[in-house]
């Protein structure tokens, strides 16, 4: 495997010096721009930038002295020259795209650096999958740093996965060239209670001088939170309110605030800056999970920065939260995150800092996008057969696999029901009185069935439960092999025959998302790589995903980003109630609970 290597600052320092001194011409000069200086939080008019060997040699009022006859000159025409945007925490797989196609989608939006945790593929393919993601990331014309996944499974004992990450895996990955740290430590009870495996992973990361990502998805900010912070995680993106952000920053963590496809956590937390006046240096913007439709139609980190500004944040502070703050957190402030000498020449030209139109994107000194169009190649790996064909059900499913028997003699039961909350990761633990017909518990009203079908080891296992909040009507079902984080197959439906049809269809195509109604397939997004990603262009995947959205709406669901909500119902590290291949999980207590409450005649 041949990676693209980018020369280090020490390697090219002699060339930078010669250019800055005027003894050697720059490769590229950007003239007549407004310099957005994120170190001093100011805009300086009438500045030039000189670039040599992909790095910045000079920023000042006049670069004509280091401009030669072969120098490429770009006229900024008075536009703002700001650093390329950084996504501080994200999962490429959530876009349903490979790293190459994800890069193709986000580069025109001004994203030049990503810190990605491929724990989705780790749950399916293990270390091999992580290495494939890492290797394709290193081929790209922008900076994609990989965090080694920490928790597969995310909650040991409450789910099974296709692979279990070990401390030895983490130690090995820390030697890979593109690894920047440890991915989000989702097993926060394990850290808080001193689990040896979790602590060994953290130790291997810290001893290599790298950053430990956090994930503390609990409202309890007492001793358990204190113990978690003491264990080593350096940031957290699971905050949902102002107090969460403030508490994390006061304890020395970076508060990562996310605007993804289904996450809208910026507005509630940014008041710590805009109203409380706290130091914004420890605030970082991220996306966490963005599906392809969001990337194609709305943007990426430019969307997050604009949203922060719309929430009352000063534009320069919002830009810092997506550039220098992120770079500093990962120890890369001498490499990326600002337009200053020695740094990679990752630059955006924009005519407005508030609405942030991304007009020209430069990465490593070359124009990579202009006026919304990509101008470079984003190379693909040749994904091996082991990464495809990962849906193993063990047998063809039938409607009977989705039956949930009632206690003997019951005409109705009390069920524990997963309640979906629009635009938020947490669910609600609800109870509902459900009817019994022919000895089987049936959904009623807004309560329909949910099942998790084991797909990694062909056990034939199916866990059945109930969910509310989707608003589905008629005889329908939706199935997906994107089922965070264990990525078995999740099926939601109002009719068990449709559920079987949808599940078997995904086994046939090797993974993806489908929706059936009255025996007919309404939409299909094929995701042949690990059942999580497509190597087709983002526009094509987004178009198919839009058909999926329209099909869900036709079946009565009007939730925003409903299929993202659908994919999160097995995420057993975010409260309150989730489904796993081992049963129904109350994440508040990290214990399995019965679907049907005990019945007393």
UniProtKB/Swiss-Prot annotation:
Signal peptide: none annotated. Pfam families: Adenine_deam_C, Amidohydro_1. One of its GO terms (molecular function) is adenine deaminase activity. One of its GO terms (biological process) is adenine catabolic process. PANTHER family: ADENINE DEAMINASE (PTHR11113:SF2), N-ACETYLGLUCOSAMINE-6-PHOSPHATE DEACETYLASE (PTHR11113). Belongs to the metallo-dependent hydrolases superfamily. Adenine deaminase family. This is Adenine deaminase.
